[in-house]
Curated annotation (Swiss-Prot):
Function in brief: PPIases accelerate the folding of proteins. It catalyzes the cis-trans isomerization of proline imidic peptide bonds in oligopeptides.
Official protein name in the record: Peptidyl-prolyl cis-trans isomerase A
Pfam families: Pro_isomerase
Compartments it resides in: Periplasm
Enzyme class (EC, first level): isomerase
């Protein structure tokens, strides 16, 4: 009886170590995007956006974002990346995740959010960095909204620089940089 009770207590402690609260207690993860335009450091909010943060970190740890591009850039709005290579070939993402846009985080300048289609729960690998306050993307403004899951803590000048590069259309894609802006690597910082 004592052995089974001790085993149950140990299991509860082990499972609690994986909870969002336990992750937050360790400190929110920081991710470094090394790009052809400079470095951008992100701080992710695992307490308010645990699904989006886990999804993003899983892509980072798998190397998925390495050698992808910021394939859509719009001055005064945002820079979007995480899905295409330099030839505008889309990488195969993991299944979509739940939209966490109702988490209270807002699409303000310097935040990072999940990109998606018209289907509210369609976000996979693509993300965008807001280079302006974009309240119309927040939960309930016009639809469910776009889930913010972190913010830029270093390198906002790099994001601003990327947002100003010349763009053109490539096939069906608009606002594509004429010279690719490449995410050379993405890594979780210790």
């Amino acid at each position: 009886m004592l052995k089974s009770t001790l085993a149950a207590v140990a299991a509860v402690f082990a499972l609690s170590a994986l909870s969002p609260a336990a992750l937050a207690a360790k400190g929110d993860p920081h991710v470094l995007l090394t790009t052809s335009a400079g470095n951008i450091e992100l701080e992710l909010n695992s307490q308010k956006a645990p699904v989006s943060v886990k999804n993003f970190v899983d892509y980072v740890n798998s190397g998925f974002y390495n050698n992808t591009t910021f394939h859509r850039v719009i001055p005064g709005f945002m820079i979007q990346g995480g899905g295409f290579n330099e030839q505008m070939q889309q990488k195969k993402p993991n299944p979509p995740i739940k939209n966490e846009a109702d988490n209270g985080l807002r699409n303000t300048r310097g935040t990072i959010a999940m990109a998606r289609t018209a289907d509210k729960d369609s976000a996979t690998s693509q993300f965008f960095i807001n280079v302006a306050d974009n309240a119309f993307l927040d939960h309930g403004q016009r639809d469910f909204g776009y889930a913010v899951f972190g913010k830029v803590v270093k390198g906002m000048d790099v994001a601003d620089k990327i947002s100003q590069v010349p763009t053109h259309d490539v096939g069906p894609y608009q606002n594509v940089p004429t010279k690719p802006v490449v995410i050379l690597s993405a890594k979780v910082l210790p």
